[in-house]
Structure formats: structure tokens, C-alpha cells
Amino acid sequence: MTTSKQSLFTHPIHLGLGATAIAQPEMTGMEFYAAYSERTASDGVEGRLVSMYRFDESWDSWEMHPSGDEVVLLVEGSMTLLQEMPDGSVATTILGPGDYAINAPGVWHTADVTEPATALFITAGLGTDHRPR
């Protein structure tokens, strides 16, 4: 299916079974994710959400994806990714434009932002959890 041009900032893409790429409805905040999970549940752990965000400040929570890897690709600016490892240690990775990091399944992660940053995410979102920072 061919769709008209969309902005990844407002309309994420679902990568699904059978090598499909499905444009998603407009991102509306946290309620988007609940509806997305329902729409794509039949893809199970193989489904991926491709999204892009601009950050002007550090994240206020940690998140974790238990079902698969998440790719974080920095497009612009600078971001420090913090990953809480299974042994409790925290790995720190500074990302610049074009750099990427992978959040492994079950690894809690957050980010510090000291200048505006834009990042692209490819997320195995099934079962994603959040906790306060």
C-alpha cells in the first residue's frame, strides 16, 4: 500500500509480520501506545515501532522493553543514554549525530539531554514498562 507523505514525528510506522510497513495514526501521547498495542497485538514480539522524537530536556522516567531489542539512533544534537545492567551497574553512552546504541531486552534505560536532540527509535514494544527516575 502506498500512502501520502507523513512526518515520523507525528505518525510512527509499524514494521510487522510479512515485511509490512504500516503508517500509524497521529501520535497523541501515552494513549497512542495502548491503542497501538491493541492494533498490532497479532504481530507479537516480531512487531516494531519506528518513531522519532525531539528532546529539549532529560527524560523523567526509565523504560524497559522485555520482548526485544530497541535501536536508538541519534539524528541531531547530543544525548547520554544510561542503561541499567542486570548486575545493577549503569552503563553510560554518549551519542552524537549518526551514532546508535541498542537497548537489550530487559535493560532499563533513560537519557540525559544537555542540548536539543533528535532521535529515531526502532522498538520491540510488546510489554514495555516504565518507572520514575
PLM segments and residue spans:
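A short, N-terminal "cap"/entry segment at the start of jelly-roll beta-barrel domains
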Residues: 1-61
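Double-stranded beta-helix
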Residues: 2-15, 110-133
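Short, charged/polar surface micro-motifs in flexible loops or helix N-caps
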Residues: 45-46, 55-59, 78-80, 87, ...
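Short, surface-exposed beta-edge/turn micro-motifs
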Residues: 47, 68-71, 117
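A short beta-loop-beta micro-motif enriched in histidine and acidic residues
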Residues: 57-71, 88-89
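Short glycine/proline-enriched turns and hinge-like loops at secondary-structure junctions
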Residues: 65, 86, 113-115
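Short, conserved beta-strand element in jelly-roll/cupin
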Residues: 66-81, 85, 122
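Short acidic-glycine-tyrosine-enriched beta hairpin
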Residues: 85-105
